[in-house]
Amino acid sequence: AELEYTHWADGIKTYFLSYVDLVGSTNFGDIKNVFGTLTKTKKGFSYSKKKCPRVPYHSDCLQIALYSKLLPKHKPFLTYASNDDRVIFTPENCVELRTESLQYYYEELVLYQKCWETKLELANGDAKVLAMLCKPDLSEIRKDGFWWKGIDPDIIKRFRSYYE
């Protein structure tokens, strides 16, 4: 079961609410699944296997950096697993999980939050203004990417209307 933690960030004067997958007496870590792609074919379905990353994904480094602030006396690890591959990253085998790297990622996470805070202040409650401050990747809609697959066309039309 995930454990809930909060962390006050002075740089943005707010709390982060976090749920850490695994916490032991000396270590904490997160478990990531790496899924292949299921594709419909003329004969049914085809599943393409996906390898685990050779270095942690950037967003996961930001997450572990935050967790390291929540659990400063614990050593981090990050695992990825697919149906036929697995990898465990630790500070011993991964530069990204070392203390100095995690501090860099934490500062980057705070910067992202400051940017969002500024966008929200500039928008002043106007969703259309906020949308214009956040460049969309419209190519993902056109490609019917993962996040857009199966979304009602009316919702896509409404989303696009914020950019007109």
Tell where the protein language model's regions lie, with residue ranges:
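Catalytic cores of nuclease domains that cleave nucleic-acid phosphodiester backbones
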Residues: 1-49
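Intrinsically disordered, low-complexity coil segments
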Residues: 9-11, 36-54, 96, 118-130
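Classical nucleotidyltransferase
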Residues: 29, 40-69
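Metal-dependent nuclease catalytic regions and adjoining charged, substrate-binding loops involved
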Residues: 56, 66-164
